């Protein structure tokens, strides 16, 4: 029968490798297109990650995401997402590795949280943008899409510039909304840099040079949130590239 949700395989289990792993959730997502997502409990120490990735490489697996969830004196927990043609064989080899103590198969972050809208700036404006973004994301998520909304209230040119540049390092971040009354200087330069890397940037209509550097300028914060979600939703017929004007 199917394994209970959240089940793990303890290292050395006599059962067939993979038989007690959490199934890859597939509602709205084809298993053939979804990465194999695993939480590995390993021993701690130098060379552990090298050993794990070596096993994956031996199966021609392509690691699309990796993070260290927990690192203790004795035990480390790794989260990996891997594209592989033979998940069963890979799991079998991980099962017999002397560095792996337990394996849990989970749903990928892309499947659970999907694309991310990042909102930053002044708290009052961020809150209003979030209302629009969350309301619009709800419409698309009901139809099977996955869009999540992240917010951080920040003030100051340097903190905001650092945060803008960091967005491109966030997994699955697709659009950034800058919400405030005045932004320019180093923030403008950061906006131009992340846009060059493919990130969509929407700015509220504010003082400073950031609006001029952004893809889109929206006066109403709620509408800005709505348009941010529409810009990345696959279930919406909306494209910033097709707009005849940049300011709304």
Regions found by a protein language model. Give the residues of each.
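Conserved mixed alpha/beta catalytic, RNA-binding, or beta-rich assembly cores of soluble enzyme
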Residues: 106-239, 243
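Amphipathic, positively biased hydrophobic alpha-helical segments used for protein targeting
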Residues: 12, 18, 58, 235-239
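A conserved regulatory-domain signal marking ACT and ACT-like small-molecule sensing domains
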Residues: 25-120, 136, 151-155
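CheY-like receiver
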Residues: 246-248
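Compositionally biased, low-complexity flexible segments
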Residues: 1-20
